[in-house]
């Protein structure tokens, strides 16, 4: 598992209080992990802080799953 995946999972577990086993690549923040719209905004801000990347609102609106977040961060960090 990549460093990005591990760090993203840690942030999600800390912010949403979910079991790490539920945080899989295709897990939807809202449908599978119980996040609401405020949670998703807070996750995006936490990702930005942790990885030193900027996630524009247009991009944030396309990040629905754990895998979406990892892909965006990896691309933005490259």
Swiss-Prot record:
InterPro entries: ACP, ACP-like_sf, PKS_PP-bd, PP-bd_ACP, Ppantetheine_attach_site. 4'-phosphopantetheine is transferred from CoA to a specific serine of apo-ACP by AcpS. This modification is essential for activity because fatty acids are bound in thioester linkage to the sulfhydryl of the prosthetic group. One of its GO terms (biological process) is lipid A biosynthetic process. Its main location: cytoplasm. Residues 2-77 form the Carrier domain. Pathway: Lipid metabolism; fatty acid biosynthesis. Pfam families: PP-binding. Transmembrane segments: none annotated. The modification O-(pantetheine 4'-phosphoryl)serine is found at residue 37. Carrier of the growing fatty acid chain in fatty acid biosynthesis. Belongs to the acyl carrier protein (ACP) family. SMART domains: PKS_PP (SM00823). The keyword Endoplasmic reticulum does not apply. This is Acyl carrier protein. GO terms for molecular function: acyl binding; acyl carrier activity; phosphopantetheine binding. One of its GO terms (cellular component) is cytosol. Keywords: Cytoplasm, Fatty acid biosynthesis, Fatty acid metabolism, Lipid biosynthesis, Lipid metabolism, Phosphopantetheine, Phosphoprotein. It is found in: Cytoplasm. PANTHER family: ACYL CARRIER PROTEIN, CARRIER DOMAIN-CONTAINING PROTEIN.
């Amino acid at each position: 598992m990549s460093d990005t995946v591990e760090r993203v999972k840690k942030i999600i577990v800390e912010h949403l209080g979910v079991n790490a086993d539920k945080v899989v690549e295709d897990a939807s923040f809202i449908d599978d992990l119980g996040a609401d719209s405020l949670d998703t905004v807070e996750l995006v801000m936490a990702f930005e802080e942790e990885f030193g990347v900027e996630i524009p609102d247009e991009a944030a609106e396309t990040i629905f799953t754990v895998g979406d977040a990892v892909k965006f961060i990896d691309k933005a960090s490259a």
